[in-house]
A protein has these predicted regions:
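Short secondary-structure transition/capping segments
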Residues: 11, 32-33, 81-83, 129-132, ...
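Small-residue-rich anion-binding loops in enzyme active sites
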Residues: 1-11
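RNA substrate-binding interface of SAM-dependent RNA methyltransferases
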Residues: 1-3, 17-20, 26-125
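Active-site/ligand-binding-proximal alpha/beta "capping" segment
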Residues: 118-169
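Short connector loops at helix/strand junctions that flank enzyme active sites
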Residues: 12-14, 38-40, 135-136
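Short, charged, surface-exposed secondary-structure boundary motifs
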Residues: 8, 105, 171-175
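Structured adenosyl-cofactor binding patch, chiefly the S-adenosyl-L-methionine
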Residues: 16-19, 60-64, 75-91, 151-190
């Protein structure tokens, strides 16, 4: 049976287990917002194509009560099998809102809904994360580990923030950075 299953799915089943699921229909970001409690806590991804990292970030979002994941046009789907596996299935509990133009969506979130759109920008000494007020509605924006946030998306954000770090370390894995940012929300809103 294992060989037959591997033939059907086209890849090696490490533990001989296969799951079948249905991808939920996409959620329109601006249709979703009126149904969410305030202050909003959102996460957006720009250019995040590593499915494993995306899956762990999804799991982190679920753990910290993020209300929706906004997936920019240059990011991978959080429903890729490796993303689903690394999310430990939490991707099916978190509303996922794909957008065709992340820059435009972020500008609209800020202008029309008062959401602070905060770019995770390693190396920024201007705004360190603990100094940023995240008690109100906010959307953290994370980019790919190699390229970071694209210039157009960075320009669309209302501010940037960096995690204070020592010893010449300039960045963290995106899911780890996400956990630090989201913990700061938990700390400030306590």
């Amino acid at each position: 049976p294992k060989r037959l299953m591997e033939t059907i799915v086209g890849f090696h089943l490490h533990q001989g287990i296969m799951a079948v699921g249905k991808i939920p229909p996409p959620v329109g970001l601006f249709d979703l917002l009126p149904r969410l409690a305030k202050p909003y806590l959102l996460v957006a991804v720009d250019g995040l194509t590593n499915a494993e990292n995306l899956g762990v970030l999804v799991r982190t979002c679920a753990a910290f009560g993020v209300q929706a994941l906004i997936v920019g046009e240059t990011s991978s789907s959080p429903y890729l099998r490796r993303a689903v596996r690394n999310s430990m299935g939490t991707v099916f509990t978190l509303p996922v809102a794909p957008v065709e133009n992340l820059s435009k969506a972020l500008r609209q979130l800020h202008a029309s809904y008062g959401v602070e759109t905060i770019a995770a920008q390693p190396g920024s000494t201007k705004n360190l994360l603990p100094q940023i007020n995240v008690r109100g509605a906010c959307c953290f924006v994370f980019g790919s580990e190699g390229e970071g946030i694209s210039p157009s998306v960075l320009e669309a954000c209302s501010e940037t923030a960096a995690i204070p770090m020592h010893n010449g370390v300039d960045s963290l894995n995106v899911a780890v950075a996400g956990a630090v940012f989201l913990y700061e929300v938990r700390r400030q809103r306590a």
